[in-house]
């Protein structure tokens, strides 16, 4: 099966640019009720996926080391590329196979899809993969009953 059947295209995906500040990242994650979000560079290439946990750990570690007046400035000046990532979201190419998708989906709630130049073209959501196989399983069950 072609994995592009599952893709949510970039035009329908919220993402961040790597030069965004921590505040901009938090705002976008909060406004969309996400726990993680893909990050691309100005060329449109996938860089990494940032999670709520990555942001919180960075804020906590820097917050404790700053004077009171500098604490608000922290989230408005540090960019997300300055943050350590605790989860390494793997990508797949558009011509990848279902086995790769399933393997990655066990640990990632979405899989970023890139082309041959690492240009971000969209995501495949774990929920879409599960829904597809659930539907297929239910169809097979109904055929056996008939």
Map each language-model feature to its residues.
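Bateman (tandem CBS) regulatory domains
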Residues: 1-13, 75-88
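Short beta->alpha transition motifs characteristic of CBS
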Residues: 46-63, 107, 120-137
């Amino acid at each position: 099966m072609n994995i592009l059947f599952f893709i949510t295209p970039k035009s329908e995906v919220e993402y961040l640019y790597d030069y965004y500040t921590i505040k901009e990242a938090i705002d976008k994650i909060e406004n969309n009720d996400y726990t993680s979000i893909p990050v691309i560079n100005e060329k449109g290439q996938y860089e990494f996926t940032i999670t709520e946990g990555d942001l919180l750990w960075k804020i906590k570690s820097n917050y404790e080391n700053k004077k009171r007046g500098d604490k608000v400035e922290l989230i408005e000046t540090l960019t997300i590329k300055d943050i350590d990532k605790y989860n390494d979201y793997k990508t797949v190419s558009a011509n990848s196979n279902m086995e790769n998708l399933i393997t990655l989906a066990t640990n990632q709630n979405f899989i970023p899809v890139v082309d041959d130049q690492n240009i971000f073209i969209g995501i495949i959501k774990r929920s879409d993969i599960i829904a597809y196989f659930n539907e297929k399983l239910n169809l097979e069950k109904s055929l056996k009953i008939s």
